[in-house]
């Protein structure tokens, strides 16, 4: 049970990091081009 919860949390964190990276990249792309 505990391992599954940790896996879920880490998966959510990875999703958030990827989302933020994409948003930042798009923001910079729009501002520079």
UniProtKB/Swiss-Prot annotation:
Residue intervals on the Cytoplasmic side: 1-12
Record field: transmembrane: 13-33
Highest taxon in the source lineage: Bacteria
InterPro entries, per database record: YkgR-like
Entry keyword Glycosyltransferase: no
Membrane topology of the entry: Single-pass membrane protein
Induction details: Constitutively expressed, repressed in minimal glucose medium, by SDS/EDTA (envelope stress), at 10 degrees Celsius and H(2)O(2), induced in minimal glycerol medium, by thiol oxidant diamide, strongly induced at 45 degrees Celsius (at protein level). Transcription is dependent on CRP.
Keywords: Cell inner membrane, Cell membrane, Membrane, Stress response, Transmembrane, Transmembrane helix
GO annotations of cellular component type: plasma membrane
Compartment list: Cell inner membrane
NCBIfam families xref list: membrane_YkgR
Name of the protein: Uncharacterized membrane protein YkgR
The organism of origin for this protein: Escherichia coli (strain K12)
């Amino acid at each position: 049970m505990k391992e599954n919860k940790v896996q879920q949390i880490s998966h959510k964190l990875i999703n958030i990091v990827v989302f933020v990276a994409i948003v930042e990249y798009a923001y910079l792309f729009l501002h520079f081009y």
